[in-house]
């Protein structure tokens, strides 16, 4: 399971160091794609396959399903770690998530999320302020 928060910088070649604790779980080859809230999602191959199978069950007749799967899959890219534990993030994904230098990499159960530090600070502060309300809303999910 991925968990924790780490800060790293993207170098001038668009490479990002993946935290050592995440490398083994991600494996040598994994998938990175556009996430929600202007971040990137990265999935180990096994988790990506599970997600892909679920998304393939969405009805093609639903416009939202078509739009979501187009957006999600068109941004997907297979990545691999180099010998220094870095990934080269495709330029379209760097642009989507406004990633320039300072990043925050967080573990979220079955995936990691890659955020620009400024965007993460905004999202985190907003969640922190409303955490009690968020927790109350999760009661219906048996958490």
From Swiss-Prot:
Q: Which is one Gene Ontology cellular component term of this protein?
A: cytoplasm
A GO molecular function term, named singly, is: DNA-binding transcription factor activity
- PROSITE patterns recorded for this chain? SPOVT_ABRB (PS51740)
Compartment(s) where it occurs, according to its Swiss-Prot or TrEMBL record = Cytoplasm, Nucleoid
Q: Does the keyword Repeat apply?
A: yes
List keywords of the entry alphabetically: Cytoplasm, DNA-binding, Repeat, Transcription, Transcription regulation
Q: Where is the SpoVT-AbrB domain?
A: 5-47, 76-119
| Transcription regulation listed as a keyword | yes
Name the Gene Ontology biological process terms. negative regulation of DNA-templated transcription initiation
Q: Which InterPro entries match?
A: MraZ, MraZ_C, MraZ_dom, MraZ_N, MraZ_sf, SpoVT-AbrB_dom, SpoVT-AbrB_sf
Q: Which family does it belong to?
A: Belongs to the MraZ family.
Family annotation (PANTHER family) = TRANSCRIPTIONAL REGULATOR MRAZ (PTHR34701:SF1)
Q: How does it assemble?
A: Forms oligomers.
- HAMAP family from the UniProt entry: MraZ
Name of the protein in its database record: Transcriptional regulator MraZ
Which gene produces this protein?
mraZ
């Amino acid at each position: 399971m991925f968990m924790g928060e780490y800060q790293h910088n993207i170098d001038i070649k668009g490479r990002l160091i993946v935290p050592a604790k995440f490398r083994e779980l991600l494996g040598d080859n994994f998938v990175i794609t556009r996430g929600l809230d202007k971040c990137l999602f990265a999935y180990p191959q096994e988790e990506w396959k599970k997600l892909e199978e679920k998304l393939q069950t969405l009805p093609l007749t639903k416009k939202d399903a078509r739009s979501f799967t187009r957006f999600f899959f068109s941004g997907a890219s297979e990545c691999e770690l180099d010998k220094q534990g870095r990934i080269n993030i495709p330029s379209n994904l760097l642009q989507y998530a406004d990633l320039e230098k300072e990043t925050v990499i967080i573990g979220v159960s079955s995936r990691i999320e890659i955020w620009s530090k400024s965007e993460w600070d905004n999202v985190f502060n907003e969640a922190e302020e409303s955490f009690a309300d968020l927790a109350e809303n999760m009661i219906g999910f048996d958490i």
